[in-house]
Swiss-Prot record:
Function according to Swiss-Prot or TrEMBL: Plays a major role in antagonizing the type I IFN-mediated antiviral response by degrading or inhibiting multiple cellular factors required for either IFN induction or response pathways. Acts cooperatively with NS2 to repress activation and nuclear translocation of host IFN-regulatory factor IRF3. Also disrupts the association of IRF3 with CREBBP. Interacts with host mitochondrial-associated membrane (MAM) MAVS and prevents the interaction with RIGI. Interacts with TRIM25 to suppress TRIM25-mediated RIGI ubiquitination and thereby RIGI-MAVS interaction.
Subunit: Monomer. Homomultimer. Heteromultimer with NS2. Interacts with the matrix protein M. Interacts with host ELOC and CUL2; this interaction allows NS1 to form an active E3 ligase with ELOC and CUL2. Interacts with host IRF3; this interaction leads to the disrupted association of IRF3 with CREBBP and thus reduced binding of IRF3 to the IFN-beta promoter. Interacts with host MAVS; this interaction prevents MAVS binding to RIGI and inhibits signaling pathway leading to interferon production. Interacts with host MAP1B/microtubule-associated protein 1B.
InterPro entries in the record: Pneumo_NS1
Placement of sequence motif DLNP: 136-139
GO terms under cellular component: host cell mitochondrion; host cell nucleus
UniProt similarity note: Belongs to the pneumovirus non-structural protein 1 family.
Lineage: Viruses, Riboviria, Orthornavirae, Negarnaviricota, Haploviricotina
Source organism superkingdom: Viruses
GO terms classed as biological process: symbiont-mediated perturbation of host apoptosis; symbiont-mediated suppression of host adaptive immune response; symbiont-mediated suppression of host cytoplasmic pattern recognition receptor signaling pathway via inhibition of IRF3 activity; symbiont-mediated suppression of host cytoplasmic pattern recognition receptor signaling pathway via inhibition of IRF7 activity; symbiont-mediated suppression of host cytoplasmic pattern recognition receptor signaling pathway via inhibition of MAVS activity; symbiont-mediated suppression of host cytoplasmic pattern recognition receptor signaling pathway via inhibition of RIG-I activity; symbiont-mediated suppression of host cytoplasmic pattern recognition receptor signaling pathway via inhibition of TBK1 activity; symbiont-mediated suppression of host JAK-STAT cascade via inhibition of STAT2 activity
Keywords tagged on the record: Host cytoplasm, Host mitochondrion, Host nucleus, Host-virus interaction, Inhibition of host adaptive immune response by virus, Inhibition of host innate immune response by virus, Inhibition of host interferon signaling pathway by virus, Inhibition of host IRF3 by virus, Inhibition of host IRF7 by virus, Inhibition of host MAVS by virus, Inhibition of host RIG-I by virus, Inhibition of host RLR pathway by virus, Inhibition of host STAT2 by virus, Inhibition of host TBK1 by virus, Inhibition of host TLR pathway by virus, Interferon antiviral system evasion, Modulation of host cell apoptosis by virus, Viral immunoevasion
Source organism of this protein record: Human respiratory syncytial virus B (strain 18537)
Pfam name, any one: Pneumo_NS1
Protein's cellular compartments: Host cytoplasm; Host mitochondrion; Host nucleus
Domain comment in the entry: N-terminus is important for IKBKE/IKK-epsilon reduction. The DNLP motif has IFN suppressive functions like binding to host MAP1B.
Name by which UniProt lists this protein: Non-structural protein 1
Length: 139
């Protein structure tokens, strides 16, 4: 059995509702799949969404491995990525403990990803996003 190793990335998040504001987010993840960490997630997509007044973050990958520090993401966080080729969407993590009174996220906010969403939960979430953004993600 391999031991769990800590992997960390820092991502500058564009605020969904004010393009002039950014926040620095620290993401940590424990995994024993060390070999896969080096390259499996080079094309991961990290983005935020606000549902019912609560900000969430998720990571979409083509691997079941956690994000690692080889990922440098510069992305438009207002765009909903479409899952293709068996990609995974990681469990949504609520960021209320990272929010400031002005609505922005605290610098170095720490998030842990532990599991991916089930197919039924993912479908429900995608439908919510579709309704929220006025998109048909099933076409």
């Amino acid at each position: 059995m391999g031991c769990n190793s800590l992997s960390m990335i820092k991502v500058r998040l564009q605020n969904l509702f004010d393009n002039d504001e950014v926040a620095l987010l620290k993401i940590t993840c424990y995994t024993d799949k060390l070999i896969l960490l080096t390259n499996a997630l080079a094309k991961a997509v990290i983005h935020t969404i606000k549902l019912n007044g609560i900000v969430f973050i998720h990571v979409i990958t083509s691997s079941e491995v956690c994000p690692d520090n080889n990922i440098v993401v510069k992305s438009n966080f207002t765009t909903m990525p479409i899952l293709q080729n068996g990609g995974y969407i990681w469990e949504l993590i609520e960021l209320t403990h990272c929010s400031q009174s002005n609505g922005l996220m605290v610098d170095n906010c720490e998030i842990k990803f532990s599991k991916r969403l089930s197919d039924s939960v993912m479908t429900n979430y995608m439908n919510q996003i579709s309704d929220l953004l006025g998109l048909d993600l099933n076409s």
